Curated annotation (Swiss-Prot):
Extracellular side: 1-25, 80-100, 159-196, 260-272
Gene3D superfamilies given in the database record: Rhodopsin 7-helix transmembrane proteins
Protein name: Olfactory receptor 2C1
Cytoplasmic-side segments: 50-57, 121-139, 220-236, 293-312
Subcellular localization: Cell membrane
GO molecular function: G protein-coupled receptor activity; odorant binding; olfactory receptor activity
Lineage, highest ranks first: Eukaryota, Metazoa, Chordata, Craniata, Vertebrata
Length: 312
């Protein structure tokens, strides 16, 4: 950051989740348990998508990509959070903070784009079933995944670069438990209106455009589903789409609330828990949402466990 003094180069102090030290062990246990569930749930989906031949479809290719993103998304912030909750030190190095800023933005924006890609995949599956395999071929699937990754990287470079140009005010106390743009803007001296405008502009683009595409896709999907004569077919299509819509609502809702509110005006404790929601809670519940009513995943898991018992 321009104007950064020597002390700031030594690192930042993460203020954490709560101002009450007596609650830190409770938060540590709860967050550790949630993180372990995140690792288990998303790793299971990735393994099933790779090992089960019946799941070698575009839908599960993108779902395994989403699980990989969720694993990385949670891992970019939770281990540091656990370290700070466990010990007396609440610091993060300058390099660690900057790395976290870039990676968190990259993964978050990539997930925004990937959710749009998954909506497109569902649209083709429901509205163009006879051409689904031809349209969603492996080459296109990989291309869409790469576009999502590069789009997220572009967002990270733009927002992080603008944020790192801000001069610091002298103190190194980052409100919250991770280095992200709204928290870093609060550390700045002088006029931050340009940074806030860039933040709002980029976040609005990564929210309004994807959500518009998703809404249009699901309106078309709903029309197609209502034309299905089989009640079982309608139920299966609605269940698959409902899972994706719930994930979209959780991720976009919490991320938009955390990033589009003015950094200077948002409530401190509220902002911390919103950040916790999209950095840990959403990655934890995504596997549950996609698998609880998904018979294909349940069947694949039973077959995999059955093979494990036979080998044992």
């Amino acid at each position: 950051m321009d104007g950064v003094n020597d002390s700031s180069l030594q690192g930042f102090v993460l203020m954490g989740i709560s101002d009450h030290p007596q609650l830190e062990m409770i938060f540590f246990i709860a967050i550790l348990f949630s993180y372990l569930l995140t690792l288990l749930g998303n790793s299971t989906i990735i393994l099933l998508s790779r090992l089960e031949a019946r799941l070698h479809t575009p839908m599960y290719f993108f779902l395994s990509n989403l699980s990989s993103l969720d694993l990385a998304f949670a891992t970019s912030s939770v281990p540091q959070m656990l370290i700070n909750l466990w010990g007396p030190g609440k610091t993060i190095s300058y390099g660690g903070c900057i790395t976290q800023l870039y990676v968190f933005l990259w993964l978050g924006a990539t997930e925004c784009i990937l959710l749009v890609v998954m909506a497109f995949d569902r649209y083709v599956a429901v509205c163009r079933p006879l051409r689904y395999t031809a349209i969603m071929n492996p080459q296109l699937c990989w291309l869409l995944a790469v576009i999502a990754c590069l789009g997220g990287l572009g967002n990270s470079v733009i927002q992080s670069t603008f944020t790192l140009q801000l001069p610091l005010c002298g103190h190194r106390r980052v409100e919250g438990f991770l280095c992200e743009v709204p928290a870093m803007i609060k550390l700045a001296c002088g006029d931050t209106s340009l940074n806030q405008a860039v933040l709002n502009g980029v976040c609005t683009f990564f929210t309004a455009v994807p959500l518009s595409i998703i809404v249009i896709s699901y309106c078309l999907i709903a029309q197609a589903v209502l034309k299905i004569r089989s009640a079982e077919g309608r139920r299966k299509a609605f269940n698959t789409c409902l899972s994706h819509l719930l994930v979209v609502f959780l991720f976009y809702g919490s991320a938009s609330y955390g990033y589009l509110l003015p950094a200077k005006n948002s409530k401190q404790d509220q902002g911390k828990f919103i950040s916790l929601f999209y950095s840990l809670v959403t990655p934890m519940v995504n596997p549950l949402i996609y698998t609880l009513r998904n018979m294909e995943v349940k069947g694949a898991l039973r077959r995999l466990l059955g093979k494990g018992r036979e080998v044992g």
